[in-house]
Swiss-Prot record:
The gene is rpoC2. It comes from Lobularia maritima. GO terms for biological process: DNA-templated transcription. Its EC number is 2.7.7.6. This is DNA-directed RNA polymerase subunit beta''. It comes from the Eukaryota.
């Protein structure tokens, strides 16, 4: 005990880690017995002092950290700014989530650090502080939840919830925080139950793999070793891990410091020797590990090293395999199934920040960087090579070198303050921080129309797909508008770009029958008004009828408005044709069914000359049965001339139509069945059958009569003719003519019965054989053609039309030719005659060259009453219009086709009431996703807002241009109000938004001369060249668009500043929120420019969504999206370090080498690359051998590192050698490949690595094989003992296979001896029954190895084991 005087007295706090270190040093110095005596004394001292102190734990001991308030407030402020940026469209959802989580994680971690300092300064003897920080019970994370803040939690799917729990358990949780906490709490409860069973099963599998590993030799004689260096080329290995790695190992080589040998081969390492290596800074130390041992079925003492129990070399007969399996499996109960630790979840590796040392100006070479976005969506510069950044102060110039692939967060010439972050250094070296790809779906939070920027790739990823990829960062916009589906409507009158009344539409689409006021009351109210007053005051007041709109059924074609309203309309002469629709009352008088008239308008709205405009199918000319059509006399019908041929678009094949010149036609009915060629017909040809006779197995006849069977290509046509059969005499004249119609009055002359015919009959001669014939007299249905439907009853006359430029001609068409058979599809009826309205216009006037006219629907609303019109415009083109100086009313910038033809104004109010104005909008028509129904999007003035007037706007560059006498000015569709049709651009929607000049135009009406007030737009239209076109037709001035100043509001932590830019506002341009257009204030909404006026802008509300490259956009351009529809899918990478999958599942993934684990993703790629390169350099046999060897070394290193990383992250210490024994077993097999066929092994066979090498040496030929990673389960089922395999899993299969193969079990392992009740070959019985090969035999093998594989001597060992990452794992 004389050494006691030399010991130094320490007076400082000692925690659990320091006690462990102290015990380790005591064992090294004084041995086990003396150390245990000292520890007993420490234990007694501890109990005595704890009793005397009488520490208790109460709720008052939980002290909240004072700085928590402002820390949380600061984080909330940052989150608020982030939310604003997301709303403005500056960052997308994934960037917002990432940044939000990192803000709160940083706050939580800072609070955790403050907690320890706070306790230490204010109350060092606080029981909570002493309990947790001494390591007695509880850890920093648990105490942090008690007195700090609970922080971020994960949801049941393992994703982070970006709403943090700001309270701690001492303060108490709010209801929301409590529910969020329950996710983690429930997971914890389930964890505890499942963890024990999982850990037990893991232990069983581990022991199964290595139960036969016993120490059976002192030295295996290996020459291999693995190098460990404290100063790694990638990063410094921590001293503690370096010491843990080396202590208890055996050296594989002599260690030299200079020329002096300080340690010998096969010497075991203690703490003193390791400290000497650290002191002298030895570069690399080669040690022996279980990996280097030359046998897979046992291990030698030197390769295993010291026993952890007594500190000496392991004894012979020690069952180190079972110890290793239990050492790894037992701490499994301490591991969590899923961690709740959230650090670095969304970060891809650690990032270091470079801060400015003092205030100054930044200078760097801008050519060496290029702009990018950080993972938080902040603008930054990415540098590809080393970049020198200079910070210039008044008297100091400081230079910083930024490594490649780092982000520069400041601009050139920017002033930075001291400690401001100027760069973020990303870790450029390869680490095992594997990434996983995660999908994040963004859903629309409003309904409207989808709009892409030009940056979206319009070609979908797959054919017939609506997923579009994004090549670069851009915005997606959801333009506002309320949508309705029109699936209930058979034929919708509303077309794209029409103006409509919104309540009218909504009432129709919901429940019209529930209206309390019916159409009779509307008409009564209308007709009871004084019509003489109407001419004076303009329009009677029907404001109380605003809610009564539309008709009582769903057909949009008809509307309960009366053509007496026509005098409320005005129109320009000779260039339009208006067709008002008939009211319901008039239809009921004419007994026309509601769905009778179908108006056919082409998709593009273009009519050609003589095209069918509408048709009416009279139900009187409808038949359900098949038959033959006959005209009265063949001379009476004539086919329409070729140039007047009508194209009927209702059917796919154009049928020729015949214009009827006669008053009647005949229909001869017959029953027709078209049967497949293989049908079994149960009746004979030319036989007579009755009604309901079975023709085939499942077809019965509907009429009786004569059967006629005709066999055609691949089908049989069976006809049944009803009628009388007549066998005529030779003198009968009728029988000589076949296929004639006989009118009433003529009788059968030679028949015994003589009577006059009452109806028409059809006589048909039928000849079954050459000699025999008879006549079939068939009944005929006669159809008289009624007078044509009066056009005026269908379409009331337009009061304003002076001259009919456009004519509607009524034609009756027979849809089938003379003698042609009519065929129906299943039970559908056959229409024989169709009444068509053919559109034509004057051939004489100047517009006779027009072959096409445009048409569209117009809806006119008068104080809640609505009238629908079809407007057909005789204008040469909708793009250009020739000005006429002679007619000022027809001249102007906008063509007559583009002007709004209808406008009615009440002289009392001047402008319509605001409520009515907001109830009108423009229809945008879309196809729905299911393609079954069309959707309408209604854009009303409530979806728009106005900015202006801009009083400070200056007009620049007034250019005088000489305009020819009749110039053609091109106006594109986008030049008018965007999103509304130019044809009817100002119809109610934007009345409050536009400024008008009122001019009087005198119109001559049939009734009286009245003055009508028209309003002409005084706003400017911009053409495609960006010029503003002057609406005054007589002036030659063309203005440039005015320029507005933009102010971008930059929010900084220290100050706000404005940056002024100048731009041209053009139609269709998008604005994000918080962009200053006027000097006074930023405008508060985002949207798209709809109308540009002289001093103001009309903007349609829109919501921006930012999307970054690689995102997938769902839906098509201009498709209607509803609230909750998937808008974008982001695919982003998330770190797969020990944070998402943690604890037992992680260890299990690694040990089972599952495909979902990142080992197979990253390691396999590296292994394949290595094998290819080596095979190419060295050729096939050597390439495979060395490639397999390197592969095995690589995979072993990776597996050990990954398993240790998981355990260390949970604070569990396991010695490397235990993991190495397990990993050695799961990497000890190789797969025989097909490249080099051998006579011993089959391709695809699993054999041991050492077995393959020995066989190759014995045969003196190389066996080609590849390395394979087996999981622990698969390795357990691929051992040398079938008894061990059968007792693990799949007993019947394993035993049956072993019996078929005739396998022999040599009972070398522990388990098989236990099963059979023998002595286990471990401990005292390890050398019983074991066969030892002679020393001479061993020498022969070694000599052969030296002869054939001399390549593995000397320097080759360094090639195979040069990896210095083996023990290089982060804590």
């Amino acid at each position: 005990m004389a050494e006691r005087a030399n010991l130094v007295f320490h007076n400082k706090v000692i925690d659990g880690t320091a006690i462990k270190r102290l015990i380790s040093r005591l064992i090294d110095h004084f041995g086990m017995a003396y150390t245990s005596h000292i520890l007993d004394q420490v234990k007694t001292l501890g109990f005595q002092q704890a009793t005397a102190t009488s520490i208790s734990l109460g709720i008052d001991d939980l002290l909240t950290i004072p700085s928590k308030g402002w820390l949380v407030q600061d984080a909330e402020q940052q989150s608020l700014i982030l939310e604003k940026h997301h709303h403005y469209g500056n960052v997308h959802a994934v960037e917002k989530l990432r940044q939000s989580i990192e803000i709160w994680y940083a706050t939580s971690e800072y609070l955790r650090q403050e907690m320890n300092l706070n306790f230490r300064m204010t109350d060092p003897f606080n029981p909570v502080h002493m309990m947790s920080f001494s390591g007695a019970r509880g850890n920093a994370s648990q105490v942090h939840q008690l007195v700090g803040m609970r922080g971020l939690m994960s949801d049941p799917q393992g994703q982070m919830i970006d709403l943090p729990i700001q309270s701690n358990l001492r303060e108490g949780l709010s209801l929301t925080e409590y529910i969020i906490s329950c996710y983690g709490a429930r997971k914890g409860v389930v964890d505890t139950a499942v963890r024990t069973s999982d850990a037990g099963y893991l232990t069983r599998r581990l022991v199964e793999v290595v139960q036969h590993i016993v120490v059976r030799r002192t030295d295996c004689g290996t020459i291999r070793g693995i190098s460990v260096s404290p100063r790694n080329k990638n990063r410094m290995m921590s001293e503690r891990i370096f010491i843990q790695t080396l202590i208890g190992r055996v050296l594989a080589d002599d260690i030299y410091i200079g020329s002096r040998c300080v340690a010998f081969r096969n010497q075991d390492l203690g703490i003193g020797l390791v400290n000497r290596f650290i002191t002298f800074g030895t570069q690399s130390i080669s040690i022996r590990t279980p990996f280097t041992c030359r046998s897979t079925s046992w291990i030698c003492r030197l390769c295993y090293g010291r026993s952890p129990t007594h500190g000496d070399l392991v004894e012979l007969g020690e069952a180190v395999g079972i110890i290793a399996g239990q050492s790894i499996g037992e701490p499994g109960t301490q591991l969590t199934l899923r961690t709740f630790h959230t650090g670095g979840v969304f970060t891809g590796g650690t990032a270091e920040h470079v801060r400015a040392p003092y205030n100054g100006k930044i200078k760097f070479n801008e050519d060496l960087v290029h702009p990018t976005r950080t993972r938080h969506g902040h603008p930054a510069f990415l540098c590809y090579i080393d970049l020198s950044v200079i910070i210039e102060s008044e008297d100091i110039i400081h230079s910083v070198t930024i490594p490649p692939k780092s982000f520069l967060l400041v601009q050139n010439d920017q002033y930075v303050e001291s400690e401001q972050v100027i760069a973020e250094i990303r870790e450029g070296t390869y680490t095992f921080h594997f990434k996983e790809r995660v999908r994040k779906y963004i859903y629309s939070d409003s309904e409207g129309e989808m709009h892409w920027s030009t940056d979206v790739s319009h070609a979908p990823e797959f054919t017939y797909s609506n997923v579009h990829l994004l090549p670069k960062t851009s915005h997606l916009w959801i333009l506002s508008g309320s949508s309705c589906e029109s699936s209930l409507i058979r034929f919708s009158i509303h077309k794209d770009q029409d103006q409509m009344n919104i309540p009218f539409f909504f009432v129709k689409s919901k429940a019209i029958s529930s209206l309390s006021v019916n159409n009779d009351q509307v008409s009564q109210k209308f007709f009871s008004s004084d019509f003489s007053d109407k001419k004076k005051s303009g329009i009677p007041n029907y404001s109380e009828l605003n809610e009564i709109v539309g008709t009582s059924h769903y057909n949009f074609i008809y509307s309960a408005i009366f053509h007496e309203n026509s005098d409320l309309l005005a129109k320009r002469r000779r260039n339009r044709f208006l067709i008002p629709f008939q009211s319901i009352q008039e239809q009921e008088k004419e007994f026309i069914p509601h769905s009778g008239i179908s108006i056919e308008i082409p998709i593009n709205g273009i009519f050609r000359r003589n095209s069918i405009f509408a048709f009416f199918d009279d139900p009187r000319y409808r038949r359900k049965s098949c038959g033959i059509l006959k005209y009265g006399t063949l001379k009476a019908d004539s086919i329409i001339q070729k140039e007047d041929m009508i194209e009927y678009r209702g059917v796919q094949k154009f049928k020729t139509k015949y214009e009827m010149k006669v008053d009647r036609f005949f229909f001869i009915p017959e029953e027709v069945h078209i049967l497949p060629e293989s049908s079994a017909i149960m009746v004979q040809n030319y036989s007579i059958i009755g009604v309901d006779t079975r023709i085939t197995l499942n077809i019965r006849s509907q009429v009786g009569g004569l059967i006629r069977v005709e066999r055609k290509k691949k089908r049989i046509e069976l006809k049944i003719f009803s009628g009388d059969i007549h066998f005529p005499d030779k003198t009968d004249k009728i029988s000589r003519h076949s296929g004639i119609l006989i009118p009433p009055g003529r009788g059968k002359t030679n028949s015994k019965e003589f009577k006059k015919l009452k109806n028409w009959i059809y006589v048909q001669r039928i000849t079954p054989t050459k000699k025999k014939f008879f006549v079939l007299v068939r009944p005929v249905a006669t159809y008289e053609i009624a007078d044509s439907i009066n056009l005026a009853t269908l379409f009331p006359q337009d009061l304003f039309r002076e001259k009919d430029n456009i004519q509607l001609r009524v034609f009756n068409y027979i849809l089938y030719g003379n003698g042609k058979p009519t065929r129906g599809i299943s039970d559908t009826s056959i229409q024989l005659v169709r009444t068509c309205l053919v559109l034509n216009w004057d051939q004489d006037n100047k517009n006779s060259s027009l072959e096409e006219v445009r048409s569209f629907f117009v809806e006119v609303s008068t104080k809640g009453l609505i009238r629908d019109f079809i407007r057909i415009g005789l204008v040469k083109s909708h793009i250009s219009y020739i000005r006429k100086r002679q007619n000022p009313a027809d001249s102007g910038l906008i063509s007559a086709d583009h002007m709004n033809p209808f406008y009615s104004i009440s002289p009392k109010a001047g402008i319509l009431q605001q409520s009515l104005r907001q109830n009108h909008g423009t229809i945008r028509m879309f196809l729905n996703r299911n393609k079954e129904s069309q959707s309408l999007l209604i854009l009303s003035s409530s979806n728009c807002f106005r900015i202006g007037p801009f009083n400070h706007v200056k007009y620049h560059n007034v250019i005088n241009q000489s305009i020819k006498k009749n110039p053609i000015i091109t106006i594109k569709n986008s030049s008018g109000p965007l999103g509304t049709a130019i044809q009817i651009s100002n119809f109610y929607s934007f009345l409050p938004l536009l400024t008008y000049n009122q001019i009087s135009v005198i119109k001559y009406l049939q009734l009286d001369n009245l003055k009508y007030i028209f309003q002409v737009i005084n706003s400017y239209l911009i053409d495609e060249n960006g010029r503003i076109l002057n609406p005054d037709p007589y002036s030659n001035v063309v203005l440039n668009p005015f320029k507005l100043n933009w102010y971008f509001l930059h929010q900084n932590y220290h100050h706000n500043y404005c940056e002024e830019t100048s731009t041209i506002i053009s139609l269709g341009q998008f604005f994000c929120e918080n962009v200053c257009i006027a000097k006074k204030e930023p405008h508060l909404k985002s949207g798209q420019v709809l109308i540009v006026e002289r001093d103001s802008v009309v903007i349609r509300s829109a919501k921006p969504y930012l999307a970054t490259p690689g995102a997938k956009v769902h839906g098509h351009y201009r498709e209607i999206l509803y609230e909750g529809d998937t808008l974008v899918t982001f695919i982003y990478e998330k770190s797969r370090s020990g944070d998402i999958t943690q604890g037992l599942p992680k260890v299990e993934q690694v040990l089972e080498v599952r495909s979902i684990d990142s080992i197979s993703l990253n390691l396999e790629k590296r292994i394949k690359g290595w094998n290819k390169c080596i095979t190419r350099i060295l050729g096939i046999p050597w390439g495979f051998l060395i490639g397999a060897e390197l592969t095995i070394v690589q995979s072993r290193i990776s597996l050990v590192n990954k398993i240790q990383k998981v355990y260390r992250s949970q604070g569990v210490q396991i010695h490397n050698r235990h993991i190495e024994i397990i990993v050695r077993q799961i990497t000890s097999k190789v797969l025989v490949s097909e490249e080099g066929m051998s006579n011993v092994f089959l391709p695809g066979e699993l054999i041991g690595l050492l077995q393959a090498e020995r066989t190759g040496r014995a045969l003196e030929e190389a066996i080609c094989y590849r390395a394979i990673l087996l999981g622990i389960t698969r390795a357990s089922l691929n051992t040398q003992s079938f008894i061990s395999e059968a007792s693990f899993q799949e007993t019947a299969r394993v035993l049956a296979k072993a019996a078929l193969r005739g396998r022999i079990d040599w009972l070398k392992g522990l388990k098989e001896n236990v099963v059979l009740g023998g002595v286990i070959p471990a401990g005292t019985g390890f050398n019983k029954g074991l066969v030892h090969c002679s020393r001479q035999h061993t020498n022969i093998l070694l000599e052969k190895k030296t002869k054939n594989f001399s390549l593995f001597e000397g320097n080759m060992r360094d090639i195979l084991f040069y990896h210095r990452e083996f023990f290089d794992s982060s804590i």
